Amino acid sequence: MALNLTVDIDKDSGFCFGVVYAIDMAEEILEEDGYLYCLGDIVHNDEEVARLKAKGLRIIDHAALPDLKNEKVLIRAHGEAPETYRIALENNITLIDASCPVVLKLQNRIKTSYDQDEKILIFGKHGHAEVIGLQGQTNNEALVFQDIAELDQVELPASFTLYSQTTKSVDKFYAIKDELIKRGYEVKANDTICRQVSNRYEDLGAFAKQYDKVVFVSGKKSSNGKVLFEVCQKANAQSYFISDPAEIDPTVFTANDRIGICGATSTPMWLMKEVKAALEAL
């Protein structure tokens, strides 16, 4: 028996402007040249990466970059460390720089702090592409932590400058700042969180509350997806995380449910539309 679900897609979900810019740039060159190298996944969404690979996108890692000569290589929205630009120059590689302007601004601020001999802490995910690029601005001397508990084991300087990965939670950032000040440190905090991402937290919570159930669509590698899914769960306990329509579990829905679909800033709208069609077919 058909479940007769009413399904809406959150109009504010989908790619942020930084990702749109990188993908538009890639598609333009793929159309002209038929292929393009990209340093790391262009976006943390396997389905979108597969779509672009089919058009000729070739994903390489940093270890493969020194072996390339006289090629075009796309730098994705996450940005890159100075070392990448140095290798490109040596190997006559044309960099198609699609670094997000918000990330570039943050890189410049961190570089300025480092040049002024400030001690730098970065609230961010270990090993994340953006964070690696940020650390590169400090000759990898900045201390990265993703949870304040990590700092319990570290001897911190009496004063330091605190930065954040652009997709982190604003509330968590300020809670960390307040806690560090409470512990007696002199903290110069730079709120460098992208407002297109942070504004989604509030809007997404309001969206999730309107529905019986929420289906959140995101790549499993997306940091932003993890944070936004937590927002959904907080607003609506019946929120379900999937990466593609094949992961839909029909048993969690009941007849005439009102379903809201939303996603990360790395989730393509076409994928959310496929999920909508799959839910409406149940």
Question: Residue spans of the language-model regions?
Answer:
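The feature marks the mature, well-folded catalytic cores of soluble enzymes
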Residues: 1-282
